[in-house]
Amino acid sequence: MAATRTASRACEIFTTLEYGPAPESHACALAWLDTQDRHLGHYVNGQWLKPEHRSSVPCQDPITGENLASCLQAQSEDVAAAVEAARASLENWSTQPGAIRAQHLTRLAKVIQKHQRLLWTLESLVTGRAVREVRDRDVPLAQQLLQYHAVQAHTQEEALAGWEPMGVIGLILSPTFPFLDMMWRICPALAVGCTVVVLVPPASPTPLLLAQLAGELGPFPGILNVISGPASLGPVLAAQPGVQKVAFCGAIEEGRALRRTLAGWVPELGLALGAESLLLLTEVADVDSAVEGIVDAAWSDRSPGGLRLLIQEAVWDETMRRLQERMGRLRCGHGLDGAVDMGARGAAARDLAQRYVSEAQSQGAQVFQAGSEPSDSPFFPPTLVSDLPPASPCTQAEVPWPLVVASPFRTAKEALAVANGTPRGGSASVWSERLGQALELAYGLQVGTVWINAHGLRDPAVPTGGCKESGSSWHGGQDGLYEYLRPSGTPAWIPYLSKTLNYDAFGLALPSTLPAGPETGPAPPYGLFVGGRFQAPGARSSRPIQDSQGSLQGYVAEGGAKDIRGAVEAAHQAAPGWMSQSPAARAALLWALAAALQRREPNLVSRLERHGVELKVAKAEVELSVKRLRAWGARVQAQGCALQVAELRGPVLRLREPLGVLAIVCPDEWPLLAFVSLLAPALAHGNTVVLVPSGACPIPALEVCQEMATLLPAGLVNVVTGDRDHLTRCLALHQDIQALWYFGSAQGSQFVEWASAGNLKPVWVNRGCPRAWDQEAEGAGPELGRRAARTKALWLPMGD
């Protein structure tokens, strides 16, 4: 009888082909928690730190609600102790030969391999993610990251000559993927010689386990320190002496708030924000493969966020039908069950998804869900949102996990307009069997990473990042290394925060312009150079410029907000044409401008002399300006893309794309040379520019504009003169400027960092410190080229 029942059950299984449970034991994770008495503290300087009189939060299984342990909440004293440990270890670690650092990273990779079951079980248990994703993707990728960066450390002395480690790095993680996000960022930082303090969200034990494994390796215990606490401790971490950079990974609004809070505190803030991705499906795509790509992009536990799906109208109905059928076969369950597709990410993620669905329905959207879950269930079913009106607020809001928001499009041009119409620019995939069409769409998308007929591929050697509100920091590849390096000889930055700075009043009012006294001769008035010609300012006001003897040298226009608006509009109109120019065409224009400056040398030297510059220095400044234009013209020819081979078959193109409209506020020192040194790399990399020249001596820059009026396309370069603080305010608050370089006062630098949080534009400020523009390293070094363009990784996987 028993044999009959067994045979019947086996027959039923083969008939229905239903999944059965495949649970993964979590005994090893609980055993590790028991070694800490289920009470986790912080891991600092190679040992556990469990101070008294600290509040704690429970670490729970997000699916069952079982209390696994308690985690201490850090306070400012704990943050200070972690930073002090990192500072004490910095000199020893950063001065080690690259080969020694490589050996240490390789040993850590072997330790992770040895304890991989403990790592994947603990990560799945506390995050709720499917164990097969952590086991088959996260942990192997962590080992690959360490091995790749060990190789980079070994070759650092030759490959990264002229660069040095920043110092102590502060890292603030999000609760979604704390283990993998931490690995992406600590590997390059440690490889180049930095030490790290990681602030992990409460109840995130996996980073603490990793820190323990690293600390037990021996000779360098303080290079990696992990403390547990809320993101509100970020300003406390940034304010610690010696912290040279803060890298934040999390929600967009949290990053925006952190940008405002840390203005004036730290020299560098790297932001990796949001988790939404985009999938663009054309009418010539393999629909079956694309549907599986959608599942991987949105409803697998490798996806950090939701998906915005654009489908060409010709295949809309067929794709939606197949997608809904595929959704019905997805399995939700406990993350430690090896047969589930989706786990649960806690009440906060579930509530966020439910709010988005409710708002979308109230705005007229159709919602399809694969199954239903009770209101008290930890799971949120896979959800497909469609028919959302184009003007509804949800079309601009970030899509949370596990939602897919689908919209149709007709032509490739319309698809790019819709895709680029959101303020985010993280990652995207293009699905098309026509390679030419796929490449055209991939090049047109304003994102950091594009996959062709695939989604979510990762490789340590390939840079990953974003643009716009997704942040401008990178990890992986050479770009990830430069995130933690600075040019050799750069002094360590100290906080320059001005607590008396009134952000609401800075640069708000224009100073009164008074007559300069009796005119001894004709003083030529200079207008604003906007749209390829000189024009009068909107305020119909000019300011006198006096020479070193107090005599009137000329009048320049007093620009304002209206003039900045016109300059930005002109730059946007010129941008498509200039970006599409070949490197040879851009080089020819830069060389032509250099020749024009050389012809105008006597006049420029005379202008500089009247400003108080010695004749010899003035001649050298003009000659060096000509040299800079020719040098960047030559470097244009070397631009292009680099081919990176990844582990998956198929190349990855590393493209360097223009930032877009770049605003530059020039310093007062070296009025001509600094102007040219900042303008040349911006033009060489395909940007259109809005410049504010030296306030004390703007006339040499305006003399150059007379040559640009006949040589350059209209709107390519726009020069607005006036009060520096007022124009800086207008530029920093402008939402259609893609990047801003500021070289002025410390207060101006602080305001620029604060105001840039509006559209999260990347900024480069000097914090009130002068720069040696006549030196090659600071006036024409690789840092300017790196700042003048952004990276895009374009994946081209091969195979059926």
Swiss-Prot record:
Gene3D superfamilies: Aldehyde Dehydrogenase, Chain A, domain 1, Aldehyde Dehydrogenase, Chain A, domain 2
GO MF annotation, one: aldehyde dehydrogenase (NAD+) activity
Disulfide partners: none
Name of one Pfam family that matches: Aldedh
SUPFAM superfamilies: ALDH-like
Subunit structure: Interacts with SPG21.
Family: Belongs to the aldehyde dehydrogenase family.
Record protein name field: Aldehyde dehydrogenase family 16 member A1
Organism, as annotated: Bos taurus
Gene: ALDH16A1
